[in-house]
From Swiss-Prot:
Binding site for substrate: 93-97, 147, 191, 218
Enzyme type, top EC level: transferase
GO cellular component terms attached to this protein's record: cytosol
Family affiliation: Belongs to the queuine tRNA-ribosyltransferase family.
GO molecular function term, any single one: metal ion binding
Subunit structure as annotated in this protein's UniProt entry: Homodimer. Within each dimer, one monomer is responsible for RNA recognition and catalysis, while the other monomer binds to the replacement base PreQ1.
Protein name: Queuine tRNA-ribosyltransferase
């Protein structure tokens, strides 16, 4: 993987990731949004449909794919790209977040995490080394280190111990990744909770270990938006300017805009797909809750500014009808729209950065939503 920083507008960055895959060279324009394909599928969508929304890279979930179908099945197909028939780049998370979200079902030790398999109840163990091995079998183009996602709220002492263990795990991840002869990219993950001092230590140590890109982890876990913005604004300038920066698990459209304002290049979130299945649809000036009875007779398209298949062919009334009847097509059409909305947003962001008018774009974005622009700490 190579990263080229093309231009900036304030702290916002316009770049390009390039990947050499067996099928040829693929580029990912940044800032980029990655749809989430937890079980080797973006729910309800074929790879061709996902690509048609503008997606250039997907996220796969190491933890869930390890439990089902498992490494052996993956190896029989070749890798995750062959298994799901998406031959463009894939980033996989390390499984850490899913393990830590199991709560009482897991026990953290220096070696790794022992936990109860949520599918069949058996006791299993996931370590930094094992995570690297699973992601190697998945053929991930971007591999994430195994870390502990520090919960919120956390005391300074807990956040410090957690961050220090994540650094030790980062080194073990790096070592096993190299031992496997993996030629793909490995990203480090900055932890440290809401404490700037800990974030600084984490970033400096990860840079010393050396990674192909750096993620900001442990955010969007319940902390107030102001806290997330503060930590993001503090952390991103600590990271190498010539490496991609990834904000994990975030988020709402305004979160993407705020991340880009603070120098982030990559995002992922289940929000566009999950919200689509629940009838919450993102449009130019906010959200349409398609289950609302006022749409029963509405013959207008979902968003007149959107070029997606759904908006070009169907009315709000039809989408309301499909949802009311529990038709699978409704969830699919909603998903197509929401994913396209996110990709259009990223396209607009990239254009604004290229034209060095990103600040104007931010003002226009919030004006359409009828919301105030969140302040920058250093403004």
């Amino acid at each position: 993987m190579k990263f080229k920083l093309k231009t900036t507008s304030g702290a916002a960055r316009r770049g390009e990731l390039t990947f050499n895959r067996p099928q040829g060279e693929f580029s990912v324009q940044t800032p980029a949004f990655m749809p989430v394909g937890t079980y080797g599928t973006v729910k309800g969508m074929t790879p061709e449909e996902v690509r048609a929304t503008g997606a250039e890279i997907l996220l796969g979930n190491t933890f869930h794919l390890w439990l089902r179908p498992g490494q052996e099945v993956m190896r029989k197909h070749g890798d995750l790209h062959d298994f799901m028939q998406w031959h463009r780049p894939i980033l996989t998370d390390s499984g850490g977040f899913q393990v830590f979200s199991l709560g009482k079902l897991r026990k953290i030790t220096e070696e790794g995490v022992k936990f109860q398999n949520p599918i069949n109840g058996e006791r299993i163990f996931l370590s930094p080394e094992k995570s690297m091995e699973i992601q190697y079998d998945l053929g991930s183009d971007i591999v994430m280190i195994f870390d502990e996602c520090t919960p919120y709220p956390a005391t300074f002492d807990y956040a410090k111990k957690s961050m220090e263990m994540s650094l030790r795990w980062a080194k073990r991840s790096r070592d096993r990744f190299d031992e496997l002869g993996n030629k793909n990219a490995l990203f480090g993950i900055v932890q440290g909770g809401t404490f700037e001092e800990l974030r600084k230590v984490s970033a400096e140590n990860l840079i010393n270990i050396g990674f192909d890109g750096y993620a900001v982890g442990g955010l969007a876990v319940g902390e107030p938006k102001e806290e997330m913005h503060r930590i993001l604004e503090f952390t991103t300038p600590l990271l190498p300017a010539d490496k991609p920066r990834y904000l994990m698990g975030v988020g709402k459209p305004e979160d993407l805009v705020e991340g880009v304002r603070r120098g982030i290049d990559m995002f992922d979130c289940v929000m566009p797909t999950r919200n689509a299945r629940n009838g919450h649809l993102f449009v130019t000036d906010g959200i349409v809750k398609i289950r609302n009875a006022k749409y029963k007779d509405d013959t207008s398209p979902l968003d007149p500014h959107c070029d997606c298949y759904t908006c070009q062919h169907y009315t709000k009334s039809y989408l309301y009808h499909l949802d009311k009847c529990g038709e699978i097509l409704g969830a699919r059409l909603n998903t197509i729209h929401n994913l396209r909305y996110y990709q259009r947003l990223m396209e607009q962001i990239r254009t604004a950065i290229e034209q060095d008018r990103f600040d104007d774009f931010v003002q226009e974005f919030y004006a359409r939503m009828d919301k105030p622009v969140p302040p920058l700490q250093k403004a």
